[in-house]
């Protein structure tokens, strides 16, 4: 009888511990990584948690999660440069499946630190991985998580998202010609009101006011695209309308940085339609024919 009581008491204790972990979204166990998550989520001591994540990484305990969680926490603590160094130094310890997620964190860190050129290169690298069929482990969709909820991301949506980020980065570099080309292709894959506004900004910066006005009315004001009901978006639309004045298009070179679009940018904006079709075929090749044609021209056309 005593053994049964002890057993039931143990079950109640285990059940209580499990419920505690669920409430605080903690992993089970007592490893260095689990202790780091407890300090981060329960004790809310970010600096102590970062030290414990370091210990977990050095102990090879759940390195995939430990490195990513530590980098994100460092970003919150305004230690983004340290987070970049950590990912670059220890990502080789992580699994192949974790590399895509680490790239996403690294892109945000580059953006926060103003390292735009490195952000551009990594975004183009991610696009190239998609073209090669290396993203999503060769599948047309992947499962993502946001605010504790899981959802499916299609390769088209991911490609459009990356192109949008690449267009924004080109805008920060004042390369509005490349940004325009990237945003146009992103809009063909998955139309979005915010990207349409960014495209209008690129056109205005190049003096293409009539075309910008046309896109603004056609793709934002007259269409019910994703994001079109956002009050912040409508405020931005009003700003764009105030910039648009009836005048002839000016020469792009007089208002934009002079830089021909190189082969890497061509690889970004060409062949995406064929690429999307390839994902819908059951037996696609690893590389699209268009990229076989582009590769020999890389040295000749590089910016």
From Swiss-Prot:
Keywords attached to this entry: Coiled coil, Nucleus, Repeat, TPR repeat
PROSITE patterns, A to Z: TPR (PS50005), TPR_REGION (PS50293)
GO cellular component: nucleus
Record InterPro entries: MS5/SDI1, TPR-like_helical_dom_sf, TPR_rpt
Main localization (coarse): nucleus
Domain of life: Eukaryota
SMART domains linked to this entry: TPR (SM00028)
Function description: Involved in the utilization of stored sulfate under sulfur-deficient conditions.
Protein name per UniProt: Protein SULFUR DEFICIENCY-INDUCED 2
Organism, as annotated: Arabidopsis thaliana
